[in-house]
Amino acid sequence: SSRYRLLKNVGLNFKTTKPLCDEELVKLRFIKSKLNKKNLPKHLAKEKALSVIKKHPNNLVVGSDTVIIFENQLINKAKNLREAKKKLIKLSGKKHQIISAVSVCYRDKEIWSSQQISTVVLKKLNNKKIDQYLEKTGKQILSSVGCYQAEKLGPQIIHSIKGDFFNVLGFPLFQFLSFLSKS
């Protein structure tokens, strides 16, 4: 994943493990609670980290999550390339917010968290351009909530990014490294 590569590329040593919480259930409960959608990534990052800390109580555990908000609606990952095309048509020529959060837990509590918001505008895309893009990316694009990967072929369809580039990749890296340097 891009988060894994990001953290490895800055020289961090760590192990990864899947969160033990049901992410979809956590998300559903959060949405039903009618809390501000923009706080969902911070909530999910914390829940993921806390679910892992149970098995690794003496380690620092880092959880992270990213969401996209477009026209005040949460955007979910596409399940197939047909859905990816619809999503790119919807986002074409328009701006959306990418919100990424990181939570650091130790023992049974969160000791630090951060959340960043970046704004991305996609180029105006026609069907042919979208089809060509999806043909190049293949199904791997389905792992990206916006159906583009800024660190790979995404610049072909991204018009502009306002805010932290690493946040667009799914991790508020500068804030995290600042936390680590103070710890």
Where are these regions (language model features)?
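Acidic/polar active-site rim loop that often engages polyanionic ligands
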Residues: 25-27, 67-69, 109-116, 161
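Short beta-strand scaffold segments in enzyme catalytic cores
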Residues: 66-68, 98-105, 148
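Active-site-adjacent loop/tail segments of enzyme domains
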Residues: 66-96, 122-124
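Short beta-strand-to-turn element immediately C-terminal to the catalytic PLP-Schiff-base lysine
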Residues: 69, 103-106, 123, 159-160
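GST superfamily/GST-like fold recognition
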Residues: 1-12, 84, 94, 117-183
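Generic enzyme active-site microenvironment
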Residues: 63
